[in-house]
UniProtKB/Swiss-Prot annotation:
This is Mediator of RNA polymerase II transcription subunit 15. It comes from Aedes aegypti. Belongs to the Mediator complex subunit 15 family. Component of the Mediator complex. Component of the Mediator complex, a coactivator involved in the regulated transcription of nearly all RNA polymerase II-dependent genes. Mediator functions as a bridge to convey information from gene-specific regulatory proteins to the basal RNA polymerase II transcription machinery. Mediator is recruited to promoters by direct interactions with regulatory proteins and serves as a scaffold for the assembly of a functional preinitiation complex with RNA polymerase II and the general transcription factors. Keywords: Activator, Nucleus, Transcription, Transcription regulation.
Length: 779
C-alpha cells in the first residue's frame, strides 16, 4: 500500500501548529520556542506519519504535564512522588529537549492511565497499535487534542452538567454529581450507561506486541494467550454490581483463566443491565456498605493514603448508598508467583505486568481496574480476588481500604499516588510518577484497527463519549472475527477550566477571538509603511530597527498568537511611529502594481500587446494617415474677369476637402463656361492614370444642397461616340450609374467612371454585369 504523505501538506502541518500553540497558551508555559519551531523540529525528525503524530502527541502532553507539575510543586502535601525522570527536574525544561529525550526511550514499555469519572472510576480501555488514528482526530474541528494521545487512554467525561472532565491530569478527580454514586465514567446521568469496554487481545504469534499499552515488551512462549481485560464497572437502575460491556466485547473469565469465545460473541454489543447481577463470569461478591463508617459526603473524592501493607491500586470513593463490587484479579503463570508484589499503579489505570517467559498456554493477566471501596475501613470484606491459571500457584494482591473522613473539601489531591508499576523477570517493581506515565512510550500507543494481532478500543482522550456510540471496525489480521470498537464522540474542547488546567480565560472564547481578529486585521495597514521605514533606517538605529522588525514579524505571521494586551501595545507603538493611517482604498494594490510595471521599458509594449486586440474589436481599426496633398493645388479657381461679376464663386469647404482628398489620378477644375451667378458648381474632371488609356473628361454638376443631394454627370457625346472603345466606356458608365444608391458623393462618381474605363479595357467587357454592391464597392 502506498505511503500516506498527507501529513506533509502545509494545511495539515498548520493545523498541528495551531494545536501546539493552544496547548502552550492553556498551560501558561513560557518557552523560547513557539509552536511553529516545535512543529518544524518534529517534522524534520519524523520519518513517517506515525512517528510524526506520535511526537506531536507527546509534545502536547508534555506541555500540559508542565502545568500539572508546577501545581504539584506549589502544593507539596498533595504532590506526586518523583520517580527519577530526568525531564522532571526543577524548572520548566524546553519541550524540544523533552522530545529528544523521549526518542531515546525506544524499548520502554508503555503504561496506560485511566481517569476517575464523576462518581467512580472510568471504564479503562487497553489496546495496542500505532498512531495512524491520530489523523482522524487531528483533522477534526472542535477536537484539537482528541484521539490517540499516547498513554492517555480511557478518559471519558460525562455528558451534561458541570462535571465534564475535558482535560483531567492524573491525580485529580472532579466532584461527581449527586444521585450518581454507582456510575462509572461515561455516565449519561443518574441511572445512565457507562462506556466501559471489555477488550480481549490475542497475539497468536507468540510475542507481545511492543505497541500495546501497559505491556512490557518481553517475548513469551508460542501459543500464549495474553488477554487484556480492562473492566469497566457500571451502576445503573438495576443494581450497582453490573459489568456492562456497553457495545464493546464482553469477555467471560472462568476460574481456569481461559477465554470463552462463545461468551465473546454472545456479549458483543450488549447493553444489558441485569439487576444485581454480574456480567463478568465468576466475578461476584458484594462489598456491603457500613453506614456507620461513612465519613464523607456523597461523591466526594477523598485523599488516599497508602500504609505499607496496602495495595496502592485502590480508589476509595464515598458514595451515597448502593453497593459496589471490588474486583482484583491477580493471575500468575504455571510456575510464577506474583504474590504480594506491591504493584504501584495510577488509580484508574489498567496495568498489564509483563512477566518472564512462561510455559505454553500461560494466561498472563493482571487486571486491577478501579477498585472501589464503599464506606470506611470495614469496607474490605466483600472484595473478590479471582485467582486463575494452569498452575494455580497464585496469590491475589491484598486490597485494603482506608478512609480518611473529610469535612468541607470535596476535592483533595491524592497523595503517594504512583502510576503503573512494571514487574520484570527479576521481580523488581519499577514505579514511575503520574507525570512520567504520560511520557513512558517513545512510540505511539493508539491501537490501529488493522494492528498486528491486536484488537482494542481506540479511546480518544479528552472526549465526552455519549454511550454507547461504538462503531465496530473489524481487524483483518485477527483470526477471530471480533470487531474492534471505535469510540466516536464529541470533544468538549480545550477550553474547559478543569482542575488539571490553569484557570486562565480561554483563548477560544468567541468574544475575545473576534476582538483579536478585528484588531489584527486593523493593524494590517501598517505593514507597508513599516517595511518602508525599516528600509530607510537600515543603517541608523540598530536597536530601534530590531524592534520594528519584531513588530513586522508579528503583523506578517498570523499563526504567531500573542495576547490581546500585547496587540494593543503594538498598535500604540505603530501609531506613535507612523501616525494614524487611513484605511487604503480597495483598488490601491492594483494602482500600485500598474504604476510599478509602467516604470519598466516593456510596460508600453505589454499594454499594446494586451489591450490592442480588445480595442480593435470594439472600435475598429485605427484611422489611417491621410494621403499627402499634391505639391500643386489640384483645383485652380479661376476668378472670372468679366465686368459683370461681382466676386469669385464660393466653393463649400466640404467640397474643397473632398477634392483635396481625391486620388492624384483625378484632375478636377472649375468649368470655365459655367454661369457665375448660380449656386451650382460645375466641374471638369480628367482621368490621368499611366496604366489606363486616355479618355475624354466628364462634366460634373455639384448641386447647392451637396452632399445631401447627389451630383450629376454628363459625358460629351460627340467625343464618347468616336470609337467603339469609348462607346463601350459610355455604356458601362451609364449601367453603373443606374446601380448607385440614391445619395452618392463626387468620389463615388469618379470611382465609377474609372471602373467603367477598366471594364471597357477588359478582353470580355460584355460578360461583366455590374451590381449595386459591386458598384458601391468600386468594383
Amino acid at each position: 500500500m502506498a505511503e500516506d504523505n498527507s501529513w506533509k501538506t502545509p494545511s495539515f502541518r498548520q493545523s498541528v501548529v495551531n494545536k501546539i500553540n493552544e496547548a502552550i497558551q492553556q498551560s501558561g508555559m513560557t518557552s523560547s520556542k513557539n509552536g511553529l519551531e516545535m512543529e518544524n523540529h518534529v517534522f524534520q525528525k519524523a520519518r513517517n506519519k506515525d512517528e510524526y503524530l506520535g511526537y506531536v502527541a507527546r509534545l502536547i502532553l508534555h506541555v500540559r504535564e508542565m502545568n500539572t507539575k508546577n501545581k504539584n510543586q506549589q502544593n507539596p502535601a498533595g504532590g506526586s512522588q518523583d520517580g527519577g525522570n530526568p525531564n522532571q527536574q526543577g524548572g520548566m525544561p524546553d519541550p524540544i529537549n523533552a522530545l529528544q529525550t523521549l526518542a531515546t526511550q525506544g524499548t520502554r514499555p508503555q503504561m496506560m492511565g485511566g481517569q476517575m469519572g464523576p462518581g467512580g472510576p472510568m471504564g479503562n480501555q487497553m489496546g495496542g497499535g500505532n498512531a495512524s488514528n491520530l489523523l482522524n482526530t487531528l483533522n477534526r474541528p472542535q477536537m484539537p487534542m482528541t484521539g490517540g494521545m499516547a498513554n492517555m487512554q480511557g478518559r471519558v467525561g460525562t455528558m451534561g452538567g458541570p462535571n465534564q472532565m475535558g482535560g483531567m491530569m492524573p491525580g485529580q478527580m472532579p466532584q461527581g454529581m449527586p444521585g450518581m454514586p454507582n456510575q462509572m465514567g461515561g455516565a449519561m446521568g443518574p441511572g445512565g450507561m457507562s462506556g466501559g469496554k471489555i477488550v480481549g487481545q490475542m497475539n497468536p504469534m507468540g510475542q507481545m506486541n511492543p505497541m500495546q499499552m501497559g505491556v512490557s515488551g518481553m517475548p513469551q512462549g508460542a501459543g500464549q494467550q495474553q488477554p487484556q481485560q480492562p473492566q469497566g464497572q457500571q451502576g445503573g437502575p438495576g443494581g450497582p454490581n453490573q459489568m456492562n460491556p456497553m457495545g464493546g466485547m464482553g469477555m467471560q473469565v472462568n476460574p481456569g483463566g481461559h477465554m470463552n469465545q462463545n461468551a465473546i460473541n454472545q456479549q458483543m454489543n450488549q447493553v444489558g443491565m441485569s439487576s444485581g447481577g454480574n456480567q463478568m463470569g465468576n466475578l461476584g461478591g458484594n462489598s456491603p456498605m457500613n453506614p456507620g463508617n461513612m465519613g464523607i459526603a456523597p461523591n466526594q473524592v477523598i485523599r488516599q493514603q497508602m500504609p505499607p501493607g496496602m495495595n496502592p491500586n485502590q480508589q476509595q470513593l464515598g458514595m451515597a448508598g448502593g453497593q459496589m463490587n471490588q474486583m482484583n484479579q491477580g493471575v500468575g503463570g504455571p510456575g510464577g508467583n506474583l504474590g504480594p508484589v506491591q504493584q504501584q499503579q495510577q488509580p484508574g489505570q489498567v496495568g498489564m505486568a509483563g512477566m518472564g517467559p512462561g510455559g505454553p498456554g500461560n494466561l498472563q493477566q493482571q487486571n486491577n481496574p478501579q477498585q472501589q471501596s464503599q464506606g470506611g475501613p470495614n469496607a474490605a470484606p466483600g472484595q473478590m480476588n479471582q485467582v486463575g491459571g494452569p498452575g494455580g500457584n497464585m496469590q491475589a494482591m491484598g486490597n485494603q481500604g482506608n478512609f480518611v473522613p473529610i469535612g468541607a473539601n470535596p476535592m483533595v489531591r491524592k497523595q503517594d499516588m504512583m502510576s503503573g508499576g512494571q514487574v520484570y523477570p527479576g521481580g523488581v517493581v519499577r514505579s514511575v510518577t503520574p507525570n512520567q506515565f504520560l511520557r513512558q512510550s517513545p512510540s505511539p500507543s493508539v491501537p490501529s484497527p488493522a494492528g498486528p494481532g491486536s484488537i482494542g478500543p481506540q479511546s480518544h482522550p479528552g472526549q465526552m463519549i455519549p454511550s454507547p456510540a461504538l462503531i465496530p471496525s473489524p481487524s483483518p489480521q485477527v483470526s477471530s472475527n471480533i470487531p474492534a470498537p471505535r469510540n466516536i464522540g464529541q470533544s468538549p474542547g480545550q477550553s474547559l477550566n478543569t482542575p488539571g488546567q490553569a484557570a486562565a480565560p480561554s483563548p477560544l472564547n468567541p468574544q475575545e477571538e473576534h476582538l483579536y481578529k478585528e484588531k489584527y486585521r486593523s493593524l494590517q495597514k501598517y505593514i507597508e509603511p513599516l517595511k518602508r521605514m525599516i528600509a530607510k533606517m537600515e543603517h541608523d538605529d540598530v536597536d530601534k530597527m530590531g524592534k520594528m522588525k519584531r513588530l513586522l514579524d508579528i503583523l506578517c505571521n498570523p499563526t504567531c498568537r500573542i495576547p490581546l494586551e500585547t496587540l494593543y501595545k503594538c498598535e500604540a507603538a505603530l501609531t506613535s511611529q507612523l501616525g494614524t493611517i487611513r484605511e487604503p482604498p480597495l483598488n490601491n494594490p492594483l494602482v500600485e502594481a500598474v504604476s510599478a510595471n509602467l516604470q519598466s521599458p516593456l510596460g508600453n509594449h505589454t499594454l499594446q500587446r494586451t489591450f490592442r486586440p480588445c480595442l480593435e474589436a470594439l472600435f475598429g481599426p485605427d484611422i489611417k494617415n491621410l494621403p499627402t496633398p499634391a505639391k500643386q493645388p489640384r483645383l485652380a479657381i479661376d476668378e472670372p474677369s468679366t465686368s459683370g461679376s461681382t466676386g469669385s464663386q464660393e466653393i463649400p469647404h466640404i467640397l474643397q476637402g473632398e477634392i483635396a482628398r481625391l486620388d492624384q489620378k483625378f484632375k478636377v477644375s472649375l468649368d470655365p463656361c459655367a454661369i457665375g451667378d448660380t449656386k451650382t458648381i460645375k466641374l471638369i474632371c480628367w482621368l490621368d492614370d499611366k496604366h489606363l488609356p486616355c479618355v475624354p473628361p466628364v462634366a460634373v454638376t455639384i448641386p447647392e444642397e451637396y452632399p445631401f443631394t447627389s451630383p450629376s454627370c454628363s459625358l460629351i457625346e460627340q467625343e464618347y461616340n468616336a470609337t467603339p472603345f469609348l462607346i463601350q466606356v459610355q455604356k458601362s458608365f451609364l449601367a453603373r450609374i443606374c446601380k448607385l444608391p440614391e445619395m452618392f458623393s463626387l468620389s463615388h462618381l469618379l470611382d465609377t467612371w474609372e471602373m467603367s474605363v477598366r471594364q471597357a479595357c477588359s478582353p470580355n467587357p460584355s460578360l461583366v454585369a455590374p451590381s449595386a454592391t459591386s458598384v458601391l464597392l468600386g468594383m
